[in-house]
Amino acid sequence: MRRGIHPEYRPVVYRDRAADFAFLTRSTATSEQTIEWTDGNTYPVVDVQISSASHPFWTGRQRLVDAAGRVEKFRAKYARRGPQRHR
């Protein structure tokens, strides 16, 4: 590999504030904010809006979508209004 062209790969904490959940991993992401982790070291922290701790699929709190109603609404909106002509 060529030196000096790759971003720095280092430990980073990702934090999901909505679920009060954080995890330490390695990444090239950068951040001005830092956090002291449970091991006593200070790491850059990246705030995320959603993670496995707050995503509806993983938490089991899914929101069901009325797919049948949406299909009927689509068909009503784009239904042809008259006999179809073949070209």
Swiss-Prot record:
Keyword Ribosomal protein: yes
GO molecular function: structural constituent of ribosome
A Pfam family of this chain: Ribosomal_L31
Record protein name field: Large ribosomal subunit protein bL31B
GO cellular component assignments: ribonucleoprotein complex; ribosome
Subunit relationships: Part of the 50S ribosomal subunit.
Entry keyword 4Fe-4S: no
Chain's gene name: rpmE2
GO biological process: translation
Keyword annotations from UniProtKB, A to Z: Ribonucleoprotein, Ribosomal protein
Protein source organism: Salinispora arenicola (strain CNS-205)
